């Protein structure tokens, strides 16, 4: 197996190595291993776009993460910048976005953010990749009392809407009419809400 991480995470055809449930499980375990050092229970924000394979990968990643004692904050379909923002604002140790950005719909990928919402440093990415490729780490699973928990964050959209509004404070968009075509992408649900909250007639 060759190098997994490219310039923007791990990408490829869905259900073809490396974008498989088996690899996603190992990615989750490896992320939890790297970020799980210390006494506190680590937590990760996990989002996705609207690709069909996102549900499959979300389930596998979550299984790997919680099996190693990491708590998962699932925010559902959200734009990539929203997941980056929520990672920082919710005090997570890292964030994961399941997306292949502009790639065809039958592709998918796994993108990881550091606690500040930015791209992982190369050395951290290399450590995660090492554990994915070289170590099964099955003997390091947490005991049954230390398995992590997965939470669905119901107000994730509201949190990002408030952030978006605050980023253009003192500017009114009232009186503007807009037609939005989100192409069934990650912003399909939240974009109209943000524009309406800013006074736009959508």
Residue spans for each PLM region:
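Ferredoxin-reductase
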Residues: 32, 39-116
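Conserved beta-strand scaffold positions in the cores of enzyme catalytic domains, especially
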Residues: 4, 72-74, 95, 150-151, ...
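Gly/Ser/Thr-enriched, mixed-charge loops and adjacent short helices
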Residues: 13, 108-202
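Loop/helix-junction capping segments adjacent to catalytic residues or to phosphate/diphosphate-binding pockets
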Residues: 21, 54-55, 81, 122, ...
